[in-house]
Each structure stands twice: as C-alpha cells, then as structure tokens.
Amino acid sequence: MPKKNDAPASFETALNELEQIVNRLESGDLPLEDALNEFERGVQLARQGQVKLQQAEQRVQILLSDSEDAAPTPFTPDAE
C-alpha cells in the first residue's frame, strides 16, 4: 500500500478519506501491518482536520471582532 503523506486538498477531502479509513479498519479484513498504516494515516488526517477547524474558528472570531464595540464571543455549540 503506498504511503500517503500529502495533505488533502480540503477539510472535506480529509474527512472523506478519514471515513474511508475507518470503514476499512472496521471491516477487520486488513492484515496487521496494513491496519497500522491505515491507523497512522487516520491519526494524521484527524490532526490536520483539527488544525483546519481551529484556523476556521479563529477566522470567525476575527470577523466577528471587526466591530470596534463588540467583544469576540467564543463559539459554543448548543447542547441538545
């Protein structure tokens, strides 16, 4: 299996690849070495995705703080 070290083109591409990796790992059909390689790639993609999400959150906070009178409000999702 070729090693994929390149960062995906977008967050969505990384998420799609990560979902495919999870499906392959959950199938239980991979040899141990391949499963470890897939897991390693999955961790790498998850970390890259987290960085992209943090960058997006920072951009949103910057955009919201453009108003001189408004203080930036941290994003907190509604718990349902």
Curated annotation (Swiss-Prot):
The keyword Cytoplasm applies. SUPFAM superfamilies: XseB-like. This is Exodeoxyribonuclease 7 small subunit. GO terms for cellular component: cytosol; exodeoxyribonuclease VII complex. GO terms for molecular function: exodeoxyribonuclease VII activity. Bidirectionally degrades single-stranded DNA into large acid-insoluble oligonucleotides, which are then degraded further into small acid-soluble oligonucleotides. GO terms for biological process: DNA catabolic process. Belongs to the XseB family. It comes from Enterobacter sp. (strain 638). Keywords: Cytoplasm, Exonuclease, Hydrolase, Nuclease. HAMAP family: Exonuc_7_S.
